[in-house]
Amino acid sequence: ALSSAASDVYKRQVVDILRRADIKTDMISITGDINVKSAQGVIVQADELLDEYVFEGDELLFLPGGPGHKSYYDCKDLLELLKEYNKKNNRIAAICAAPSILGNLGLLEGKKAMAFPGFEMQLTGAVIITAPERVVTDGNITTSRGMGTSLDLGLELVRLIKGEELAEQLRTSTQYI
């Protein structure tokens, strides 16, 4: 899901690695506009708008973080979708400040989770994991800390969806050793 002022690296790096793994990946705008401006002022063209997208067979809902994470609260459809995904045990991923959305929705209760330093207290009900860990998966939810861990998050999602072997191949081919 793309919101205004989400950090550019999170969405681009995670989407890039998922697409390299041939995982169908759609960037969905929650702003009502197909063109979404990142926190760094980069315009990203979404694939579709949330109110037009049909969620059928999607394996993952990913929330990039950054200063725009608060705008997720303004999108009631997204919040309901997150609750529905969690109820069905569908995979949800979030990075930086975005895991706080999951915490505030009660989706992290009893689960290990992490967020950008300073946002841990908003991971309501979570077992908070900190450095040196870079990404943590507990059940259907995967969280990560920030820009420097976005490739780790992408590779973890590839591992979960397509397996360890492909994740390692991508790690090597991207020189992330």
Language-model segment annotations:
Residues 7, 17-30, 47-177:
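Active-site-adjacent pocket-lining segments in enzyme domains
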Residues 1, 37, 68-69:
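Short, contiguous strand/loop micro-motifs
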Residues 3, 38, 136:
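Short, acidic, Ser/Thr-enriched surface-loop or helix-capping motifs
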Residues 12, 29-32:
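Short glycine/proline-centered loop/turn elements that form peptide/ligand docking sites
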Residues 33-40:
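Membrane-interfacial amphipathic helices and adjacent loop/beta segments
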Residues 40-48:
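Short gly/ser/thr-rich secondary-structure transition/capping motifs
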Residues 1-6, 10:
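Single conserved hydrophobic/aromatic residue that forms the stacking wall/gate
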